[in-house]
């Protein structure tokens, strides 16, 4: 097996002529550039979530896929688990009648994992994921809950999301994680320990999504 290392190692990988698909499972910020490079070099791509970090990147992926005629698939694994597939099948067969409200979540206490995320050099005390949570507010990992719900509610198959409001708690656990790793006070941890998002669709249906990777509680989505 060949190994390609370094921040730009993926470019050499994508230039190979003996592979058909590039599976992307890096930190979030590298999903987009690796996917674009792969498609530019004639490879299909399968991307772990999130596939893009802003709206422009979403459109760039779409346009590149259409231009190169290469598949660009988002690997939202929660859309394909047994419970979600079974529930989707029941919804599509009318078992629940018209579904007008749905809940989804990503509630996953990451305390056993924070120390294992990739760090950018010896000076990086946080790792990429804790650093991202410190810098960004809101639901930063929405698709585990939102993906299956969107399928069940026929989003982009006759309905669309129209309005959104989100509210979060203050940061207690996140702030303490940074302080423990840096030995200094953290007064600007932006991501609340728990975020709740409400979305209303054009057809009058309501989605509730929750995000919590900080507090100790059972895994739930």
Predicted regions located by residue number:
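Beta-strand-loop-alpha-helix segment that lines the small-molecule cofactor/substrate pocket
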Residues: 21, 27-28, 32-80, 94
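Short, well-ordered coil/turn residues at beta-beta hairpins
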Residues: 25-26, 210
